Amino acid sequence: MTEKDSFKKRILFFFFIFFTLFLFNIPKKKKKKIKKNKTTSKSNSNVYGEKKIFKKKKSDI
């Protein structure tokens, strides 16, 4: 019985380590999404530049 109990404890211990590593990996992915938002802000600045071009075209008309 003691060998089986120790085996169960090992399984729970490894599962706990795996679960904690999985939890730590989730916030890292969120940080990557924030970096993607920085690239989208650059694309938004390009969109504003295109809007300025459209305003110039309207003034030409």
Swiss-Prot record:
It comes from the Eukaryota. Its main location: membrane. The chain crosses the membrane at residues 10-27. It is a single-pass membrane protein. GO terms for cellular component: membrane. It is found in: Membrane. Keywords: Membrane, Transmembrane, Transmembrane helix. This is Putative uncharacterized transmembrane protein DDB_G0284827. It comes from Dictyostelium discoideum.
